[in-house]
Amino acid sequence: MNRLQLYFRLIRLHKPIGILLLLWPTLWALWMASDGKPDWTLVAIFTLGTVLMRSAGCAVNDYADRDFDKHVQRTVDRPITSGKIKPYEALLVALVLTLLAFALIWPLNTLTKQLSIAAVIIAATYPYFKRFFAIPQAYLGIAFGFGIPMGFAAVQNTVPAAAWWLLVANVFWSVAYDTEYAMVDREDDLKLGMKTSAITFGRYDVAIIMFCYAMTLGIIGIVGWQFGLRIWFVAGLLLAAVCAAYHYTLIRSRERAGCFAAFNHNNWLGGAIFGGVALDYLLR
Protein backbone atom coordinates (compact mmCIF):
# COMPACT_ATOMS: atom_id res chain seq x y z
CA MET A 1 0.00 0.00 0.00
CA ASN A 2 1.52 3.35 -1.05
CA ARG A 3 1.67 6.48 1.10
CA LEU A 4 -1.33 8.15 -0.52
CA GLN A 5 -3.49 5.08 0.10
CA LEU A 6 -2.43 5.08 3.75
CA TYR A 7 -3.45 8.71 4.11
CA PHE A 8 -6.79 7.93 2.46
CA ARG A 9 -7.32 5.18 5.03
CA LEU A 10 -6.30 7.51 7.84
CA ILE A 11 -9.00 10.02 6.89
CA ARG A 12 -11.55 7.26 6.09
CA LEU A 13 -12.28 8.27 2.51
CA HIS A 14 -13.06 4.59 1.94
CA LYS A 15 -15.86 4.86 4.55
CA PRO A 16 -18.13 7.74 3.50
CA ILE A 17 -20.83 7.07 6.12
CA GLY A 18 -19.19 9.54 8.51
CA ILE A 19 -19.26 12.27 5.86
CA LEU A 20 -22.95 11.68 5.22
CA LEU A 21 -23.84 11.78 8.92
CA LEU A 22 -22.29 15.26 9.07
CA LEU A 23 -23.69 16.38 5.75
CA TRP A 24 -27.39 15.62 6.20
CA PRO A 25 -27.91 17.94 9.23
CA THR A 26 -25.96 20.68 7.45
CA LEU A 27 -28.23 20.38 4.43
CA TRP A 28 -31.36 20.44 6.63
CA ALA A 29 -30.10 23.75 8.01
CA LEU A 30 -29.17 25.31 4.67
CA TRP A 31 -32.59 24.50 3.18
CA MET A 32 -34.57 25.70 6.19
CA ALA A 33 -32.49 28.85 6.62
CA SER A 34 -32.95 29.82 2.97
CA ASP A 35 -36.64 28.91 2.71
CA GLY A 36 -35.76 26.06 0.38
CA LYS A 37 -33.69 28.18 -2.01
CA PRO A 38 -30.07 27.85 -0.90
CA ASP A 39 -27.22 29.56 -2.68
CA TRP A 40 -25.54 26.71 -4.54
CA THR A 41 -22.13 28.20 -3.83
CA LEU A 42 -22.90 27.86 -0.13
CA VAL A 43 -24.05 24.28 -0.65
CA ALA A 44 -20.75 23.49 -2.40
CA ILE A 45 -18.69 25.22 0.31
CA PHE A 46 -20.43 23.38 3.14
CA THR A 47 -20.36 20.03 1.35
CA LEU A 48 -16.63 20.21 0.67
CA GLY A 49 -16.03 21.64 4.13
CA THR A 50 -17.87 18.68 5.63
CA VAL A 51 -15.60 16.26 3.77
CA LEU A 52 -12.47 18.12 4.89
CA MET A 53 -13.44 18.47 8.55
CA ARG A 54 -14.67 14.91 8.90
CA SER A 55 -11.37 13.77 7.41
CA ALA A 56 -9.40 16.00 9.79
CA GLY A 57 -11.44 14.64 12.70
CA CYS A 58 -10.56 11.07 11.74
CA ALA A 59 -6.85 11.91 11.73
CA VAL A 60 -7.10 13.54 15.17
CA ASN A 61 -9.16 10.64 16.50
CA ASP A 62 -6.60 8.07 15.36
CA TYR A 63 -3.80 10.14 16.88
CA ALA A 64 -5.61 10.34 20.21
CA ASP A 65 -6.56 6.64 20.22
CA ARG A 66 -3.27 5.25 18.89
CA ASP A 67 -2.44 3.44 22.14
CA PHE A 68 -5.96 2.01 22.46
CA ASP A 69 -6.69 0.96 18.87
CA LYS A 70 -4.14 -1.86 19.00
CA HIS A 71 -6.31 -3.60 21.60
CA VAL A 72 -9.59 -3.35 19.66
CA GLN A 73 -10.34 -5.94 17.01
CA ARG A 74 -12.01 -3.46 14.64
CA THR A 75 -9.22 -0.86 14.78
CA VAL A 76 -6.01 -2.86 15.12
CA ASP A 77 -5.08 -2.30 11.46
CA ARG A 78 -5.51 1.47 11.40
CA PRO A 79 -2.47 3.22 9.87
CA ILE A 80 -1.08 4.81 13.04
CA THR A 81 -1.56 1.95 15.47
CA SER A 82 -0.14 -0.50 12.93
CA GLY A 83 2.98 1.66 12.59
CA LYS A 84 2.50 2.50 8.91
CA ILE A 85 2.03 6.22 9.60
CA LYS A 86 3.81 8.26 12.27
CA PRO A 87 1.63 10.11 14.82
CA TYR A 88 3.02 13.49 13.80
CA GLU A 89 1.98 12.81 10.21
CA ALA A 90 -1.63 12.46 11.32
CA LEU A 91 -1.47 15.83 13.07
CA LEU A 92 0.01 17.45 9.97
CA VAL A 93 -2.73 15.95 7.81
CA ALA A 94 -5.38 17.24 10.23
CA LEU A 95 -3.81 20.71 10.24
CA VAL A 96 -3.66 20.94 6.44
CA LEU A 97 -7.26 19.77 6.06
CA THR A 98 -8.47 22.22 8.71
CA LEU A 99 -6.69 25.12 7.02
CA LEU A 100 -8.24 24.15 3.68
CA ALA A 101 -11.68 24.06 5.29
CA PHE A 102 -11.13 27.48 6.85
CA ALA A 103 -10.01 28.85 3.47
CA LEU A 104 -13.34 27.71 2.04
CA ILE A 105 -15.38 29.78 4.49
CA TRP A 106 -13.06 32.81 4.44
CA PRO A 107 -15.36 34.72 2.03
CA LEU A 108 -18.35 34.18 4.36
CA ASN A 109 -19.51 36.49 7.15
CA THR A 110 -17.72 36.97 10.46
CA LEU A 111 -20.27 35.03 12.52
CA THR A 112 -19.78 31.92 10.38
CA LYS A 113 -16.00 32.16 10.80
CA GLN A 114 -16.35 32.60 14.57
CA LEU A 115 -18.56 29.53 14.79
CA SER A 116 -16.04 27.58 12.70
CA ILE A 117 -13.39 28.14 15.38
CA ALA A 118 -15.72 26.66 17.99
CA ALA A 119 -16.42 23.75 15.63
CA VAL A 120 -12.70 22.99 15.28
CA ILE A 121 -12.17 23.05 19.05
CA ILE A 122 -15.10 20.71 19.63
CA ALA A 123 -13.95 18.30 16.90
CA ALA A 124 -10.37 18.26 18.19
CA THR A 125 -11.34 17.59 21.80
CA TYR A 126 -13.99 14.92 21.15
CA PRO A 127 -11.58 11.93 21.13
CA TYR A 128 -10.44 12.80 24.64
CA PHE A 129 -13.98 12.92 26.03
CA LYS A 130 -14.08 9.13 25.69
CA ARG A 131 -11.59 8.95 28.56
CA PHE A 132 -13.86 10.47 31.21
CA PHE A 133 -17.33 11.45 29.88
CA ALA A 134 -19.95 8.74 30.36
CA ILE A 135 -21.82 9.58 27.14
CA PRO A 136 -19.23 10.99 24.69
CA GLN A 137 -21.71 10.36 21.88
CA ALA A 138 -23.60 13.47 23.03
CA TYR A 139 -20.48 15.57 22.56
CA LEU A 140 -20.02 13.92 19.17
CA GLY A 141 -23.53 15.07 18.29
CA ILE A 142 -22.49 18.67 18.89
CA ALA A 143 -19.38 18.19 16.74
CA PHE A 144 -21.29 16.44 13.94
CA GLY A 145 -24.12 18.97 14.08
CA PHE A 146 -22.20 22.23 14.21
CA GLY A 147 -22.83 22.71 10.52
CA ILE A 148 -26.40 23.57 11.59
CA PRO A 149 -25.67 26.88 13.37
CA MET A 150 -22.94 27.61 10.83
CA GLY A 151 -25.39 27.06 7.97
CA PHE A 152 -27.94 29.44 9.48
CA ALA A 153 -25.20 31.98 10.17
CA ALA A 154 -23.97 31.81 6.59
CA VAL A 155 -27.47 32.37 5.18
CA GLN A 156 -29.03 34.74 7.72
CA ASN A 157 -26.03 36.21 9.57
CA THR A 158 -27.71 35.11 12.79
CA VAL A 159 -28.43 31.85 14.58
CA PRO A 160 -32.11 31.64 15.58
CA ALA A 161 -33.43 29.44 18.37
CA ALA A 162 -34.68 26.94 15.78
CA ALA A 163 -31.10 26.24 14.72
CA TRP A 164 -30.08 25.36 18.27
CA TRP A 165 -33.11 23.09 18.59
CA LEU A 166 -32.03 21.32 15.40
CA LEU A 167 -28.62 20.89 17.00
CA VAL A 168 -30.29 19.34 20.05
CA ALA A 169 -32.13 16.96 17.72
CA ASN A 170 -28.81 16.05 16.13
CA VAL A 171 -27.35 15.28 19.56
CA PHE A 172 -30.15 12.78 20.18
CA TRP A 173 -29.59 11.30 16.72
CA SER A 174 -25.86 11.00 17.34
CA VAL A 175 -26.44 9.26 20.67
CA ALA A 176 -28.72 6.80 18.87
CA TYR A 177 -26.49 5.88 15.95
CA ASP A 178 -23.17 6.08 17.76
CA THR A 179 -24.46 3.90 20.58
CA GLU A 180 -25.22 1.32 17.90
CA TYR A 181 -21.63 1.76 16.73
CA ALA A 182 -20.31 1.53 20.31
CA MET A 183 -22.22 -1.71 20.89
CA VAL A 184 -19.90 -3.31 18.34
CA ASP A 185 -16.84 -2.51 20.47
CA ARG A 186 -18.42 -2.79 23.92
CA GLU A 187 -16.41 -5.78 25.15
CA ASP A 188 -13.11 -4.27 23.99
CA ASP A 189 -13.96 -0.86 25.47
CA LEU A 190 -14.81 -2.42 28.83
CA LYS A 191 -11.36 -4.01 28.98
CA LEU A 192 -9.69 -0.70 28.11
CA GLY A 193 -11.73 1.35 30.57
CA MET A 194 -13.13 3.58 27.81
CA LYS A 195 -16.37 5.49 28.33
CA THR A 196 -19.18 4.94 25.83
CA SER A 197 -22.94 5.25 25.90
CA ALA A 198 -23.23 1.52 25.14
CA ILE A 199 -21.47 0.81 28.44
CA THR A 200 -23.26 3.55 30.38
CA PHE A 201 -26.74 2.51 29.22
CA GLY A 202 -26.09 -1.17 29.94
CA ARG A 203 -29.15 -3.38 29.50
CA TYR A 204 -31.28 -0.33 28.67
CA ASP A 205 -29.21 0.43 25.56
CA VAL A 206 -31.80 -0.58 22.97
CA ALA A 207 -34.65 1.22 24.76
CA ILE A 208 -32.63 4.43 25.08
CA ILE A 209 -31.57 4.28 21.43
CA MET A 210 -35.21 4.09 20.37
CA PHE A 211 -36.08 6.94 22.75
CA CYS A 212 -33.33 9.05 21.16
CA TYR A 213 -34.68 8.34 17.69
CA ALA A 214 -38.13 9.44 18.87
CA MET A 215 -36.73 12.66 20.34
CA THR A 216 -34.78 13.35 17.14
CA LEU A 217 -37.81 13.04 14.91
CA GLY A 218 -40.08 14.83 17.37
CA ILE A 219 -37.85 17.90 17.69
CA ILE A 220 -37.18 18.08 13.95
CA GLY A 221 -40.91 17.74 13.35
CA ILE A 222 -41.72 20.69 15.62
CA VAL A 223 -38.98 22.85 14.09
CA GLY A 224 -40.03 21.99 10.55
CA TRP A 225 -43.67 22.74 11.34
CA GLN A 226 -42.64 26.17 12.61
CA PHE A 227 -40.93 26.74 9.26
CA GLY A 228 -44.20 25.97 7.49
CA LEU A 229 -43.19 22.51 6.27
CA ARG A 230 -46.14 20.18 5.85
CA ILE A 231 -47.12 17.06 3.87
CA TRP A 232 -43.86 16.07 2.15
CA PHE A 233 -41.89 16.93 5.26
CA VAL A 234 -44.16 14.72 7.36
CA ALA A 235 -43.77 11.97 4.76
CA GLY A 236 -40.00 12.24 5.12
CA LEU A 237 -40.27 11.99 8.90
CA LEU A 238 -42.51 8.94 8.62
CA LEU A 239 -39.99 7.28 6.31
CA ALA A 240 -37.25 8.12 8.82
CA ALA A 241 -39.39 6.56 11.57
CA VAL A 242 -39.65 3.38 9.49
CA CYS A 243 -35.84 3.39 9.26
CA ALA A 244 -35.61 3.71 13.04
CA ALA A 245 -38.04 0.83 13.51
CA TYR A 246 -35.92 -1.28 11.18
CA HIS A 247 -32.89 -0.46 13.31
CA TYR A 248 -34.69 -1.97 16.29
CA THR A 249 -34.91 -5.29 14.47
CA LEU A 250 -31.16 -5.11 13.82
CA ILE A 251 -29.99 -4.19 17.33
CA ARG A 252 -32.43 -5.97 19.65
CA SER A 253 -30.24 -9.10 19.77
CA ARG A 254 -27.15 -6.91 20.33
CA GLU A 255 -25.10 -8.88 17.81
CA ARG A 256 -22.12 -7.01 16.39
CA ALA A 257 -23.09 -7.41 12.74
CA GLY A 258 -26.62 -6.14 13.33
CA CYS A 259 -25.48 -3.15 15.38
CA PHE A 260 -22.93 -2.16 12.74
CA ALA A 261 -25.53 -2.53 9.99
CA ALA A 262 -27.93 -0.29 11.91
CA PHE A 263 -25.24 2.36 12.31
CA ASN A 264 -24.52 2.39 8.58
CA HIS A 265 -28.24 2.50 7.77
CA ASN A 266 -28.54 5.90 9.46
CA ASN A 267 -27.51 7.45 6.17
CA TRP A 268 -30.98 6.59 4.90
CA LEU A 269 -32.65 8.06 7.96
CA GLY A 270 -30.86 11.38 7.56
CA GLY A 271 -31.48 11.34 3.83
CA ALA A 272 -35.19 10.70 4.33
CA ILE A 273 -35.48 13.78 6.52
CA PHE A 274 -33.61 15.90 4.00
CA GLY A 275 -35.71 14.52 1.16
CA GLY A 276 -38.87 15.52 3.00
CA VAL A 277 -37.56 19.03 3.67
CA ALA A 278 -36.34 19.59 0.11
CA LEU A 279 -39.47 18.18 -1.54
CA ASP A 280 -41.79 20.22 0.65
CA TYR A 281 -40.07 23.42 -0.38
CA LEU A 282 -39.79 22.36 -4.03
CA LEU A 283 -43.44 21.37 -4.46
CA ARG A 284 -45.03 24.38 -2.78
From Swiss-Prot:
It comes from the Bacteria. It is an enzyme of class 2 (transferase). It holds the Pfam family UbiA. Catalyzes the prenylation of para-hydroxybenzoate (PHB) with an all-trans polyprenyl group. Mediates the second step in the final reaction sequence of ubiquinone-8 (UQ-8) biosynthesis, which is the condensation of the polyisoprenoid side chain with PHB, generating the first membrane-bound Q intermediate 3-octaprenyl-4-hydroxybenzoate. This is 4-hydroxybenzoate octaprenyltransferase. Disulfide bonds: none annotated. Its cofactor is Mg(2+). GO terms for cellular component: plasma membrane. The chain crosses the membrane at residues 16-36, 40-60, 91-111, 132-152, 157-177, 207-227, 231-251, 259-279. It is found in: Cell inner membrane. InterPro entries: HB_polyprenyltransferase-like, Prenyltransferase, UbiA_prenyltransferase, UbiA_prenylTrfase_CS, UbiA_sf. Keywords: Cell inner membrane, Cell membrane, Magnesium, Membrane, Transferase, Transmembrane, Transmembrane helix, Ubiquinone biosynthesis. GO terms for molecular function: 4-hydroxybenzoate polyprenyltransferase activity. It comes from Janthinobacterium sp. (strain Marseille) (Minibacterium massiliensis). Its EC number is 2.5.1.39.
